[in-house]
Amino acid sequence: MTPSPAAPAAQPARSDRLTVIALSALAYIVAVGLHEHLGHSLACLLLGSHPTELGAFYSNCDYSGLSDLRIRLVALAGPVVSLAIGVVCFVLLRLRPPRAANGYYFVWLLGTLGLMAATGYLFFSGMTGIGDFGTTRDGVFYQAAPEWLWRVILTVVGLAAYFLVIRLAVRELDPHIGGVGRVRIRYARLLVLASYLTGVVVSVGIGLLNPHGLIIVAISAAASSLGASSGFLWMMQLLDRERPVALPGLVVQRSWRWIALGAAATIVYAIVFGPTLRP
C-alpha cells in the first residue's frame, strides 16, 4: 500500500492589510507622541521652564533657567512615559484583554513599542552618547564619569533589557497565533513586518516635514522606527514551533473605524507637529 502524502498544514486566515496598516500607524504615532509630549514637553513645563519647539519626533526645552538635575529629569521623562505605556498595555492584556482581534493587536503593538523605546534608548545612548540617556548636557548621564564605562554599561543593559522585552512580547502573542510550526511563524512574521514597514514609512515621511533637515530624520524619526522597533524583523522566530493553536487565531478584520482613526491621526499629527510648533 502506498502511503498517502501528509496533508498540508492549515493556513491561518489573512489579516486585512489596510486595517493592519491603520492600526500600526496609529500605534506608532501614539507611542512617539506620548513619549515626546506627555513625557519631555510636560516635564519641561512642570519643572519650571517651557518648550521652545514641539516636533513630531523631538521636544526642545528652554534649559536656561533649569539646574542640571532638572534637565536630567526632563530627559528621563520620555523613557519613563514609554515604559509606563508598555506596562499598562501588557497588564491590560493579562487582566482585561480586548475581545476583538483588532483591539488586542493594537494594545499589544502599542505596549511593545513603548517597551522597545524605553529599553532601546539605553542601547542607543550607550552606543552614540546622545539621546535621552546620553552624556551630553540634555541627557540623563551628563557628566557621568568615566564616560566610556557608563556608555558600556548602558549598551549592555539596554541590549539585555531589549531582548527581555522581545521575549515578553512574543510570549504574550504566542497563544493567539493560529496554526502550527512554520505556518504560524510565517503568519506572525508577516503581520509584524507589515506593522514595522508602516512605522518606518510614517515616521520618515512625517520626519521629513521638520525644519531642521535630514539630521532630525536620521537621529530621531528613523531611529525611533528603523532602530527602536527593529525587533519586529526577527522576534517571531522565537515563537514556540511545537505549540499548536486552533485556527483562526488572531486575524485582524477589515474595520473602517480603525482605518479612519489611523488615517486621521497620521494626517493631524503630520500637519500639527511635522513642521514643528514654536509656542
Q: Model-predicted segments: where are they?
A:
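Short alpha-helical packing/oligomerization segments
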Residues: 68, 208-231
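Transmembrane alpha-helical segments of integral membrane proteins
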Residues: 229-245
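Interfacial loop-to-transmembrane junctions
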Residues: 240-263
